[in-house]
Every structure is written in C-alpha cells, then in structure tokens.
Curated annotation (Swiss-Prot):
Keyword Lipoprotein attached: no
Site positions for Transition state stabilizer: 152
Residue numbers binding substrate: 43-45, 86, 191, 241-242
Name recorded for this polypeptide: Putative methylthioribose-1-phosphate isomerase
Taxonomic superkingdom: Archaea
Originating species: Archaeoglobus fulgidus (strain ATCC 49558 / DSM 4304 / JCM 9628 / NBRC 100126 / VC-16)
Keywords in alphabetical order: Amino-acid biosynthesis, Isomerase, Methionine biosynthesis
Sample GO molecular function, one term: S-methyl-5-thioribose-1-phosphate isomerase activity
Family: Belongs to the eIF-2B alpha/beta/delta subunits family. MtnA subfamily.
EC number per UniProt: 5.3.1.23
Pfam families per UniProt: IF-2B (PF01008)
Substrates-to-products reaction catalysed: 5-(methylsulfanyl)-alpha-D-ribose 1-phosphate = 5-(methylsulfanyl)-D-ribulose 1-phosphate
An example Gene Ontology biological process: L-methionine salvage from methylthioadenosine
Length: 339
C-alpha cells in the first residue's frame, strides 16, 4: 500500500497510529490535509511533495466555484496555506508549485480540476520511479553482510512508496544481499522505533532498535559498516534532516564509517546555504509528554527544533536518482543534477 494516494479522494496512512494500528484516513478538504501534515500523519520530504500536489487537486474539488477565475484564486490561497504548514522540507513547496502551475493553465473549471489531479498523479508515479533508481545506485555501495545504521524514517512511509535510505536497503536485499539494519529510535516522536522498525519487519528485513544515545557505542564496537539517512533539504553547504542526524554524522566521521545521504533531486535547494533555512520548531508538549504520559515537569523550558544541518564535509556521498555524487559537491552536484 502506498503511503498517500488518490482513490475518489485523498487517502493516506495515518502514521501517528503506527505501529499499533494501520489506519487509512481521508482528507476531505485542504484544512484536513494541513492538519494531517502538521501533526505528522503524513511526513517525510517526498511524501510531503506528493501531499502538496494532491492538496492542490483537493482544493480544486472541495467546493463549487462560480467560474474558473474564482477557482484559480482559491488554488493560489490554498497553495500559500499548505506551504505554511512546515517551513523546512523543500519538497512540499515543489509539489505545491508543480500542481498549481499545471492547474493554472486550465481554461475551464473542469480542466483546472483535471490538470491538477493529473499532475499530482504524475508526480506520485515519478516518486516511486526515482526511489527505485536511487535504490539501485545506492545498493552498489552495500556489500553482502553489511550492517546499516539509519536515523528517523526514510522508507516507504516517508515517500509515496519504496523509500530513499530504506529503498537502498530494500534494493540490496532484492539483489540477494544479506543486509541488517540498526534503527535509532529518533526522539522525541520516535519515527525510528515506530515507523522504520515496523516497515522493515513487515518486509522481513533484520532490524535492531537502539536509543539515539547508543550510536557511539555501536560504532565503537564495530557493529556498523555504513550509515544511510534521508534528507528534508540539501543546500550548498549542509543536509537538513531530522534532529540528531548531525550528531550521528560526527560520530560516524570519528570512526571512519561511511555516511551516505539518499535524496531525490527535488530535495536539493542549491541556491541557498544553511543560514537561509528556517528550522521548524515543534510544540513543547512533544518533550513533556510521551503519548499521554507526562515525562517532564509541565513548566520546564523546552527547545524542540525538528531538524539540524549536517555539514556536507561529513557526508561521504549523496545517493540520487541520477547516480551517486561524491565530493567536491560544489562541482559535482550541479554537474550530475544539471542545475
């Protein structure tokens, strides 16, 4: 099952319910989709790209419009509203812009609706194809018997299907290689323990769960061969990914363990540097409560950024649908991705 899809309406796996329950929910309007994005029912940069595109298609169908001009104005407002939900993941903006630009070419209400949905469906198919290509290129970096440490969730739940970092693992396993995975729990929302472990176990891939603070000891003991993570935005000097990724990269570099980032071209924002990126800050309750249980004083000060920048100097290579890119990135990224 895809993480997000159109079936007479916008459907998505509610990732807040996993691993206890696999539940598909329907977003009936843009407000419901925005809420799903904010509460992380749908998350992961490529999945958000699809959500942004499908959001424009949804906006075109959520009510009746007097004429095509009224519909187009509504779509522009919906685009701005959806873009405001999460400021760091650039893919969301890419998906919104693609579907909006396609829709605005329509000359009638029905044509606008059709063009928006067609572009969203096209984008979703492209995501699956590029993840497969990424997986094939990345699998060449893995040896039979490798243990891969990953952080957060960059699997099929974070994409339309197959995954980026976990797509590399899946492709290697599909080739007949024996690959084991160490998954970091990824505090505070535990995407690693809840989502990565769940989907790898569903696929029968060997996975061991550790706390984030155990990264050092598993590397020190020689239990990790490679690190592969995903990305929410890649700029000229850094990779923005789930908070804690930077720490993993530092420890991996200290132990001379290859640190790979798997991400599609749409995740690259090559005109910007780390200082230009707004890092989303999540609600303080995410640290004070674990589920419904209080685990910290209610009035404690909280700092809860969702992402951190990993300097590109810590990254061994970037795995993309166009191939594996090695340093110097300032030369090779534009060359390979044709920026």
């Amino acid at each position: 099952m895809r993480s997000i899809f159109w079936d007479d309406g916008l459907k998505l796996i509610d990732q807040t319910k996993l691993p206890e329950k696999l539940e598909v929910i329907e977003c009936r309007n843009v407000e419901e989709l925005a809420d799903a994005i904010k509460k992380l029912a749908v998350r992961g940069a490529p999945a958000l790209e699809a959500a942004g595109a499908y959001g424009i298609a949804l906006a075109a169908r959520e009510r009746e419009f007097a004429d095509v001009d009224e519909l187009k104005e509504h779509l522009k407002k919906a685009a701005d509203f959806l873009a405001s939900t999460r400021p760091t993941a650039v893919n969301l903006f890419v998906g919104i812009e693609r579907a909006l630009n396609a829709a605005l070419k329509g000359e009638s209400v029905e044509e606008v609706k059709e063009l928006a949905l067609r572009e969203a469906e096209k984008l979703a198919e492209e995501d699956v194809e590029r993840n497969r290509k990424m997986g094939e290129y990345g699998a060449e970096l893995l040896e039979d018997g490798d243990v891969v440490l990953t952080y957060c969730n960059a699997g099929r739940l974070a994409t339309v299907d197959w995954g980026t970092a976990l797509g590399v693992v899946r492709s290697a396993v599909e080739q007949g290689k024996e690959i084991r995975v160490i998954a970091c729990e990824t505090r505070p929302l535990n995407q690693g323990s809840r989502l990565t472990c769940w989907e790898l176990m569903e696929d029968g891939i060997d996975v061991t769960l550790i706390t984030d603070s155990m990264v050092g000891i598993v590397m020190q003991k020689g239990m990790v061969d490679k690190v592969i993570v995903g990305a929410d935005r890649i700029v000229r000097d850094a990779v923005f990914n789930k908070i804690g990724t930077y720490t993993v990269s530092v420890v991996a570099k200290h132990h001379n363990i290859p640190f790979y980032v798997a991400a599609p071209k749409a995740t690259f924002d090559w005109e910007r540097t780390a200082k230009d990126v707004v890092i989303e800050e999540r609600p303080r309750e995410e640290l004070i409560f674990c589920g419904k249980r209080q685990i910290a004083p209610l009035n404690v000060k909280v700092y809860n950024p969702a992402f951190d920048p990993t300097p590109l100097e810590n990254v061994t290579a970037l795995i993309t649908e166009y191939g594996v890119i090695y340093p110097p990135y300032e030369v090779n990224v534009p060359k390979v991705l044709k920026f």
